[in-house]
Structures are given as structure tokens and as C-alpha cells.
């Protein structure tokens, strides 16, 4: 379905995968993008079929897509402008058989990305940290455990964004309607993708 929809869609694609947190992050990113763009489609495993939304899209549209490992197995041309892998833990091994195969399939989300594209990754996941260090595209890490020189991180109950030239407070955790470290990670991933 993803490949068929992508062939018929227009505009930029922001795609999210991971073992946990996909639906929350997709919803958060969809709401963020609706503040900036008029034509936003939130699709995928979240309940809105990508194939139904694709014919309505224009070049100005933004698609926020939740993508499962099953869907990633069949991609060919699918090219997100921004991708995210939230985490990788043992799951669906009945289908993928080994953890190595599951990791390989999740990493396919970056298959067609170029140096002009971005992948957002969880720095606290050692698999993703190693993967990100070897990617030939722009990588933006997020962390709930440590301050990052570049990326998004949680410190003093505030979510921060930092790069070589600036440090910006994104929001206070008390201002969010969701709680828990895992949800703060979802917020950081969504903010990084936006």
C-alpha cells in the first residue's frame, strides 16, 4: 500500500517507524504540521489509508505517515523527506525471524533518502546510534538521558534543541498533555521532524 500510495501522492513525506511510539509521534507531528501547512494528511497504521489520501494531495501537501516493518518490506521508490526511527526492540520476530532482519527492515525507511534529507533517531538506542553514525544523510538525534551538542534533549524538565549556533527551549514538560519519558521522546522526535 505504501509504495502504491507514494507513486500517486504529491508533496513532502514525513515518515515514522519504530517498535513503540509510532502512533503517538505521528499524531503529534500531524498536529504540529497543521499549524504551518494548510494541506496535511496523517496516514498509515494510524487508521487513515495512504492510498485514499494520495489522490487529494497537491505539491503543497505534507504527508505524515506511520510506517510498520511489514510495510517497509515492500518499499521501492518510497522517499521520505524526513524519516524517524523511534526505537528498535524485539518484536514481530515470528515474521522477521531474527533481530538482525528486523533491524534491517526498519532501516529501510532511509533507503531512498539523499544528502538533502533528514533522519531523526533515538540516541539512547545503541542500535540506532550506531546506524546514525554511518548514514550519509543528515541525522538529528534526540535523547531523554543526556544533553546533546546537536539535537533534541530533555534537561531540567524542558525539551531543548541545540546545534552549533543556538540552544532553544522547545517546551516545558509540565505544559504537555502527555507524561512519561517515552512520551517526551515522542515529542522530541515529532519536534525534530518538524
Please place each PLM-identified region on the residue numbering:
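Phosphate-binding loop of NTP-binding sites
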Residues: 1-123, 127-138, 153
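Adenine nucleotide phosphate-binding catalytic loops in nucleotide-utilizing enzymes
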Residues: 98-100, 137-194
